[in-house]
UniProtKB/Swiss-Prot annotation:
Keyword set includes DNA damage: no
PPR repeats: 102-136, 137-167, 170-200, 205-239, 240-274, 276-310, 311-345, 346-380, 381-415, 416-450, 451-485, 486-523
Transmembrane region(s): none
Source organism of this protein record: Arabidopsis thaliana
InterPro entries membership: Mito_RNA_Proc_CCM1, Pentatricopeptide_rpt, TPR-like_helical_dom_sf
Keyword Repeat: yes
Family the UniProt entry places it in: Belongs to the PPR family. P subfamily.
Keywords: Repeat
Protein name: Pentatricopeptide repeat-containing protein At2g06000
Amino acid sequence: MIRTTFATAIAHFHTHSHGGAQARPLQNNTREVIHCPEAWLVKIVSTLFVYRVPDSDLCFCYLSKNLNPFISFEVVKKLDNNPHIGFRFWEFSRFKLNIRHSFWTYNLLTRSLCKAGLHDLAGQMFECMKSDGVSPNNRLLGFLVSSFAEKGKLHFATALLLQSFEVEGCCMVVNSLLNTLVKLDRVEDAMKLFDEHLRFQSCNDTKTFNILIRGLCGVGKAEKALELLGVMSGFGCEPDIVTYNTLIQGFCKSNELNKASEMFKDVKSGSVCSPDVVTYTSMISGYCKAGKMREASSLLDDMLRLGIYPTNVTFNVLVDGYAKAGEMLTAEEIRGKMISFGCFPDVVTFTSLIDGYCRVGQVSQGFRLWEEMNARGMFPNAFTYSILINALCNENRLLKARELLGQLASKDIIPQPFMYNPVIDGFCKAGKVNEANVIVEEMEKKKCKPDKITFTILIIGHCMKGRMFEAVSIFHKMVAIGCSPDKITVSSLLSCLLKAGMAKEAYHLNQIARKGQSNNVVPLETKTANATLAAC
């Protein structure tokens, strides 16, 4: 059938491409206008390879005469939504028909294969590309090294990187790989790559160092990042404002405000570069997190004097800082000031204010802001809900808290354990463990898995009600799903079992904890364990 169809299609192709007595205009009811004869061939070949690799002499002979690199590229492009079939065509045309494919065919198909997760096939194509004498450009190499690194194939990505040193603009390739590794939290791999392969190359630029500094600061290694700043000039690279902003943020994150402040002063002096809104916002954020609101406010005044206008982020940082410090009047003043600068309060602003009011016991004011948010058409996020739920539980308003939990689905908010845990804890402390169990069932139905805190709350709650067998059952479920109990969980359960005269169960439970020690299941402390054994 396929052979007959192909023969008919070939005849049709020749009719329109070579003219003669058989050639005639297309009818008015034809669905597709054929602009050139090659389009027919592209369509025929694409359709043919969707079903099978041609194996008849007729197909082979015809394709060997009429396929060329241009038509081959068009076929690959038509099959772009199915790269596996595109690879099948490329493999057939290269090895059976000796088609020398263009860079654009290799570029398109290797990208499509990677996007489909077919990295092994993409790797094969890349090797053939090199053996065919087709050189990749820096954009393709940059894409490939990032894609292979994301797939976990760092060895191949590194091999591609080493080849890029021969390509103009290799900095782009280097930075693509380093950036991918940092995004994947593989900062050690990024630094190892730099130390082993990049220190002795000329393909590093300021962006290279900025990526590494960002990665190190992100994992709390601001001091190590500072060392990179010191060696940049040796590579012919000068730090820019992004470099300094990243370091300031890193030191603030590590609670090293003195070092952040020193670097801020260097930038402010103009000896290295001029500060921008990110510089000031980073430093303000550091002071706010440390509770130094006077210094943070002073920096806001300073940046305004210099004509550096704050953004929503700047104001939100200040609102959050004052709210956490319990200075709600000042927090509200900042909200008013941000409007005067054309920065309008958003969900982050309101969430910080709600958190502040709940912290000082003014939950009703928090709900007034909640209503204001809804009136403005703002959608509360998971943190907004969590703050109010926790505040309600602290006031033993458990039914209202549960009502808020019920709104999550209608608001398209993905439920998280930290939203449910305060409510479960509240019902357990009130002795209503059955209600707590129902809530856990509800969260599991919503694909929200209980975490270590959830299980610990349930275990202690059941113990306090004397429901020891249920508590032990919850413990076994916790271990079975790979959630490792901590010392509080284990010691609380064992203590309750011993008090209930269930020494044998306590012994077996502690043995389970010891067996799971290598998997981070924490056994009972030795002294208590000995008491358990003695009781047995």
